[in-house]
Amino acid sequence: MALRRPMVAGNWKMNGSAQLAQELFKKFATKLQNDSAEVVLCPPSIYLESVRQLLDENKEALNGCLVRMGTQNVSQHDFGAYTGEISGQMLKDSGCRYVIIGHSERRRMYGETSDIVAEKFAAAQKHGLTPILCVGESGPAREARRTFEVIAEELDVVIEKNGTMAFDNAIIAYEPLWAVGTGKSATPEQAQEVHAFIRKRLSEVSPFIGENIRILYGGSVTPSNAADLFAQPDVDGGLIGGVSLNATEFLSLCTIAMSA
């Protein structure tokens, strides 16, 4: 069995502040003890420089720990007249290592199709960023027993454009749309079932990638349900929304992941 290091990625969405970043690093510096889990902070782009400075300032205190910086979106274009967009190279220059791709809110609110998601996946990797690719089904799709069909379609578009080996440098996040921001989480058994499907789907085209890729669960993860979720054999951590805005609770999730 592959040894996959758990990851806890905090997606602040359009929330947070420089003060929140300071609070998080104050706790990280005293409470994070080792590198058994990887912690990723994905603040709004305006705070990337603040987070990078805090990473530098706390480098000695965090020695032996894995705290990285990510972002919530990337343009599929390298440069040009795209007002408000940020390219992969710009994000790489800012110190980002990871980028969330295809979050359900981007797909739903901003019309990001699976083709656009696949292009953004490619743009991220082109500039040395690791995509955190989000996939997931809606409530009606689950009720219609179409969960696997929807997720397979979302994965296949990315595979068709980028090739299976592109997943050698990628993370997948399963985020059931009916659980995102609702306070209603998938049960550990439901999460495991879908994660196992994703892993099997990728294993069919590359056993190595299927075995080694990290698959996060995202959807109302809290300190009270994280241990059971993270204990599932195919759940490799979480993509965290609301709880990532509370320094104490987010640190609790990191600690749980370290012992998963």
Curated annotation (Swiss-Prot):
It is an enzyme of class 5 (isomerase). GO terms for cellular component: cytosol. One of its GO terms (biological process) is glyceraldehyde-3-phosphate biosynthetic process. InterPro entries: Aldolase_TIM, TIM_sf, TrioseP_Isoase_bac/euk, Triosephosphate_isomerase, Triosephosphate_isomerase_AS. Homodimer. PANTHER family: TRIOSEPHOSPHATE ISOMERASE. This is Triosephosphate isomerase. It comes from Shewanella piezotolerans (strain WP3 / JCM 13877).
